[in-house]
């Protein structure tokens, strides 16, 4: 409530000025005040921040730059495949190398390199990748719809756009290319666009980036021959490497904190608000789990956020341990949300058994409930063997626990499955999937989980 005139407000015989009325309306809310204790610049710990220097990736950067040297010499580019799990520096390395190449080509008269970068996370086919690449090259008013064209026409349009560039080279960066699954046609046609005569005047190179270690192995032989001229593996960071990354960022993120780089490349930290165990503990937690710098930074940021909320003067080991629990919950939610529908239906079957207090359960009981759920939403019903494989995958991802039961010669041995994470987290994520919404709508009391 905001007053703009000079009238008074009388309540129970008491005359209140406008200022008092305004204070009464917002009573209980704290004033917004700049953080002068914990964070100096919290953005450096959050997703989207771009550091000036990428540490602990010297070898990978050198290999990447070496692979692109033919371009600056006017030769055809190599096709590259970068792989490693999330948060190990693949995308950031690629952008740094591409920007350096773009900067250095400005000094050359006979080399003109065009760059196109596309994140394929939300794309699930070569057709969609090709259509989106066409729109990357076109002006907004000339862009096409992502569906409705014959496959051959889409590739013809893409090759025409490459011909129009009037450049000596075009490097196409396809990030998270594993999203297209087995439909890898684009990864054959684009790297071979010159050899097959589809593009004549511009040398085309493809840089594929994947978070999935198995994606490269599952590529067809012809794609491997075309795409993988050179492969660069980005391994997980170890605890020491993560510690250096955290120290570098902490010096910018927190008040009273400085870092200096020693001759051996390691960082030394001095801080008034970070207890000595904070950085090593964040690094150790992330290294043990995934080796992801993104996870380590998220953990340090969460610990700082908790300290700020508590109006603490420093960040402690206790903040880190509680932050680790919170980040772990968030990570499971994100990973659950990315699962394909068939995996979610499998988990739904376990939710039904959980509601019946029937976990752990054998595979055949889980499969029975999976079939009911799949039919309910008109999804394809997979075989028992396929669901067995999905149960194994869900176990490897940490969502399920499996135990072997041996009932002797008569009963035989079999496996039983149950949740390794809280069932309510699984339920919340599945309920938020529009495809599965009908399973939670309360239409059929035997199927729905409204009273879960």
Regions found by a protein language model. Name each.
Residues 1-78:
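A short, basic N-terminal segment
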Residues 29-35, 122-131, 136-189, 193-229, ...:
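Mid-core helix/loop region of P-loop NTP-binding domains shared across ATPases and GTPases
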Residues 76-99:
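Walker A/P-loop nucleotide-binding motif
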Residues 81, 104-122:
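Conserved catalytic segments around the Walker B and adjacent sensor/switch elements
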Residues 98, 187, 388-392:
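Short, hydrophobic-biased segments on the C-terminal half of alpha helices
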Residues 306-327:
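Conserved C-terminal helix/linker of AAA+ ATPases
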Residues 326-349, 353-360:
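Short alpha-helical segments that sit at the start of domains
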Residues 360-452:
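Terminal-proximal interaction/regulatory segments of ATP-powered molecular machines
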